[in-house]
């Protein structure tokens, strides 16, 4: 493509460093985009409020209601992608991995403790706390894109 920038790919970051960047973006901006695929192979993308838990490296967590469509989607097609970005778009991190629907009460409590206060919109839609499930994305691959520097970092976990 004529005039397209030639982004250099660097592999200087390791999995811990890229997850630290994901955590920093989440802590500052509170949201990320989750892309899933439905039973017909059609893509769906939505904003969620995720968290990175220090005791559980290499994973991204979110809360959902068991009746929401994304639960059926990830059970049928567990490969997903998250995107995190700064408001100025000077840093964009995309993370791919396999997602699990976890119904472990202690993990649910741990995730809720971290992100529960940030879930105002979610609580309007999910009325029954007994229906909550944890989405655990086990990260397999990440790309950190710094468009203003023409730089891309690729990390395999």
What would you call each of these model-derived segments?
Residues 2-14, 94-157:
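Charged, gly/pro-rich active-site loop segments
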Residues 37-39, 65-67, 85-87, 96-100:
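Histidine- and/or cysteine-centered catalytic micro-motif in compact active-site loops
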Residues 24-40, 80-84:
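A short, Trp-centered hydrophobic/proline-enriched beta-strand micro-motif
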Residues 4-8, 36, 48-59:
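Short, basic, glycine/proline-bearing loop/turn elements
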Residues 30, 46, 56-58, 76-80, ...:
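A generic structural signal for short beta-strands and their flanking turns/coil linkers
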Residues 7-31:
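Short, basic/aromatic recognition patches
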Residues 51-89:
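A short mixed-secondary-structure module that forms the rim of ligand-binding clefts
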């Amino acid at each position: 493509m004529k005039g397209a920038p030639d982004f250099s790919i660097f592999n200087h970051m390791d999995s811990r460093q890229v997850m630290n960047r994901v955590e920093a973006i989440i802590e500052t901006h509170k949201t990320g985009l989750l892309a899933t695929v439905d039973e017909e192979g059609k893509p769906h993308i939505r904003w969620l409020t995720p968290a990175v838990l220090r005791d559980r490296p290499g994973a991204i967590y979110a809360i959902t209601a068991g009746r929401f469509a994304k639960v059926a989607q990830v059970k049928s097609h567990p490969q997903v992608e998250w995107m995190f970005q700064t408001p100025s778009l000077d840093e964009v991190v995309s993370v791919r991995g396999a997602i699990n629907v976890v119904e472990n009460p202690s993990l649910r409590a741990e995730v809720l403790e971290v992100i529960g206060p940030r879930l105002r919109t979610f609580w309007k839609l999910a009325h029954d706390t007994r229906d909550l499930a944890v989405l655990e994305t086990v990260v397999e691959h990440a790309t950190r894109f710094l468009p203003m520097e023409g730089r891309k970092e690729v990390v395999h976990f």
